[in-house]
From Swiss-Prot:
Record function comment: Catalyzes the synthesis of the hydroxymethylpyrimidine phosphate (HMP-P) moiety of thiamine from aminoimidazole ribotide (AIR) in a radical S-adenosyl-L-methionine (SAM)-dependent reaction.
Annotated binding of [4Fe-4S] cluster, by residue: 573, 576, 581
Top enzyme category: lyase
Organism: Pseudomonas aeruginosa (strain ATCC 15692 / DSM 22644 / CIP 104116 / JCM 14847 / LMG 12228 / 1C / PRS 101 / PAO1)
Encoding gene (name): thiC
Protein's name in the database: Phosphomethylpyrimidine synthase
């Protein structure tokens, strides 16, 4: 065994231990469907009883959406060198419309497999790929249009509901503000039939390549919970396979619904295989990045044949959605000339350069129907890239951006003709007053295909804090109807994010997505808020920590000033101290009302005023007293 292999194994063993830690006071629960192999994971957070001083009652557990896969299940033995357990193979086999290939069919994939020098880096258990039988279409959209409810659709319905019926019966939905959904059609309960209808209509997608059988199915659409994406990937300047797998497991632990591998450095093929085999969430890529590497970074040397081989290579590995910049047309490129920041999309700039060098139309546009044929053979979803997105607020909503968006709408209809699933990528940098126009125009141009935006960043003045500038825009556009939000880390515009940056970006965007769900009035969205608020009022500190998006940070901040265990039951924190805690004072008012037989707090407060006034008179009505 080489030194490199030994180092890889040691690092991966460390990742194994780190990735399998359950959240505090939480356990993985599986909700079963109509068949025993539909086992949908949710996280159950157990809560302490309400103290006697606050009425003394049992608090039901809170169920939350769980993207962490088997990693947080102590019953599952995780070995990153072997990959995750299979979830979907039986479902795919039962449909009878796919075939196992004799081996990899892409030229590049075959060449990498034959290169013995890569053995130390290669994932050891490379699976034989499958593909649709000749003439077959294996997309979830195709099944949906035929009226078929797949196991994936049933799985998603259970996952989106998270025991909503039980919560409603327990009265947990009674305290939720009505939302404003801007025309979205959010039902009181998600059913498998509703999932099928939304996918058939094109309003939602299920990114689920038939070669990614480790996947736990999820859905992206404006009538479902708002999802978030986390980006990982190496660059020519750094990172390793182990670091990228670590970012993957770390990102999904904190709530990434999908992950994009944006690698542009060495060993892109091998890195992607490790990521896919260990990912329970959909993986997206930008295939033009790898195609560019194959021509040594010279955009003019790109060809349709190289790109086509790259699509097949990645589809056979199991990539669930491709960002394809087919809307960057030759006639739009001059529209960017007077922009403050020009073309900021890597994929957009690559295709713009190719178009200008050859003075030909974008080959991704001219070969789009051929791309659709590949996509439906593996059920890869389109994420139609916004190659002309604004890179500064000054460039927002200009002719180049909206011209491309109109073309993406045209391409969406072509993809739907082939029953290929589509979502649309969006900006970028947009000031707050222009965000709704983006959402409205996307719904109009793309006929309600799911929107997937990078932020948008609402101001350009905060390098190092762009997770905040973009989180503001993300919450807004999520409320207006955006289906998935691509996270931004503090390193945006500055450098390659590390593990800590990934966590910060994920938590920021979980906040934005949840705020959007609350504003839309998504059924059950407020259950967790209510449970945490109740725990806060009752000084159940551990429950406060555990119900939060980041229990570790909440606990650490509390313990910076009050580290002793006794502080975990104290009726105050270090912000106000014991005498100025508003919640403690409120409880004292309630206790006073109860002791004095008063029916409400306002009467208790008034009685307290009268009692103090009488005491003042009894003591001589003296303002200042000698002490």
């Amino acid at each position: 065994m080489s030194a490199t292999q030994k180092n890889n194994i040691t690092r991966l063993e460390q990742l194994d231990r780190q990735s399998t830690q359950p959240f505090p006071n939480s356990r993985k629960v599986y909700l079963t469907g109509s068949r025993p192999d539909i086992r949908v994971p949710v996280r159950e957070i157990s809560l302490a009883d309400t103290p006697t001083a606050f009425g003394g009652e049992k608090n039901p557990p809170v169920f939350v959406y769980d993207t962490s896969g088997p990693y947080t299940d102590p019953e599952v033995r995780i070995d990153l060198r072997k990959g995750l357990p299979d979830v979907r193979s039986r479902w795919i086999d039962e449909r009878g419309d796919t075939e196992i290939l004799p081996g990899l069919t892409s030229e590049f994939g075959q060449a990498r497999l034959a290169d013995a020098s890569l053995d130390a880096l290669r994932f050891a258990h490379v699976r034989t790929p499958r593909r649709a039988k000749p003439g077959a279409n294996v997309s979830q959209m195709h099944y949906a249009k035929k009226g078929i409810i797949t196991p994936e659709m049933e799985y998603i319905a259970i996952r989106e509901n998270m025991k909503l019926q039980e919560a409603r019966a327990a009265g947990l939905l009674d305290q939720q503000h009505p939302g404003h959904s801007f025309g979205a059609n959010i039902p009181k309960e998600i059913t498998p039939e509703f999932v099928r209808e939304e996918v058939a209509r094109g309003r939602a997608i299920i990114p689920a390549n038939i070669n990614h059988t480790e996947l736990e199915p999820m859905i992206i659409g404006r009538n479902f919970l708002v999802k978030i994406n986390g980006n990982i990937g190496n660059s020519a300047l750094g990172s390793s396979i182990e670091e990228e797998v670590e970012k993957l497991t770390w990102g999904i632990r904190w709530g990434a619904d999908t992950v994009m591998d944006l690698s542009t450095g060495k060993h892109i093929h091998e890195t992607r295989e490790w990521i896919l085999r260990n990912s329970p969430v959909p993986i997206g890529t930008v295939p033009i990045y790898q195609a560019l590497e194959k021509v040594n970074g010279v955009a003019e040397d790109l060809t349709w044949e190289i790109f086509r081989d790259t699509l097949i290579e990645q589809a056979e590995q199991g990539v669930d959605y491709f960002t394809i910049h087919a809307g960057v047309l030759l006639r739009y490129v001059p529209l960017t000339a007077k922009r403050v920041t020009g073309i900021v999309s890597r994929g957009g700039s690559i295709m713009a350069k190719w178009c200008l060098a050859h003075h030909q139309e974008n080959f991704l546009y001219t070969h789009f129907e051929e791309i659709c044929e590949i996509m439906k053979a593996y059920d890869v979803s389109f994420s139609l890239g916004d190659g002309l997105r604004p890179g500064s607020v000054a460039d927002a909503n200009d002719a180049a951006q909206f011209g491309e968006l109109e073309t993406l709408g045209e391409l969406t209809k072509i993809a739907w003709k082939h029953d290929v699933q589509v979502m649309i990528e969006g900006p970028g940098h947009v000031p707050m007053q222009l965000i709704k126009e983006n959402m409205d125009k996307q719904l109009e141009c793309c006929d309600e295909a799911p929107f997937y935006t990078l932020g948008p960043l609402t101001t350009d003045i905060a390098p190092g804090y762009d997770h905040i500038t973009s989180g503001i825009g993300a919450a807004m556009i999520g409320w207006f109807g955006c289906a998935m939000l691509c996270y931004v880390t503090p390193k945006e515009h500055l450098g390659l994010p590390n593990k800590d940056d990934v966590k910060t970006g994920i938590i920021t965007y979980k906040i934005a997505a949840h705020a959007a769900d609350l504003a839309k009035g998504h059924p059950g969205a407020q259950i967790r808020d209510n449970a945490l608020s109740k725990a806060r009022f009752e000084f159940r500190w551990e429950d406060q920590f555990n119900l939060g998006l980041d229990p570790d940070t909440a606990r650490a901040f509390h313990d910076e000033t009050l580290p002793k265990d006794s502080a975990k039951v104290a009726h105050f924190c270090s912000m106000c101290g014991p005498k100025f805690c508003s919640m403690k004072i409120t409880q004292e008012v309630r206790d006073y009302a109860k002791e004095n037989g008063l029916s409400d707090e306002s009467k208790a407060i008034e009685a307290g005023f009268q009692e103090q006034a009488a005491r003042f008179k009894d003591e001589g009505s003296v303002i200042y007293r000698q002490v």
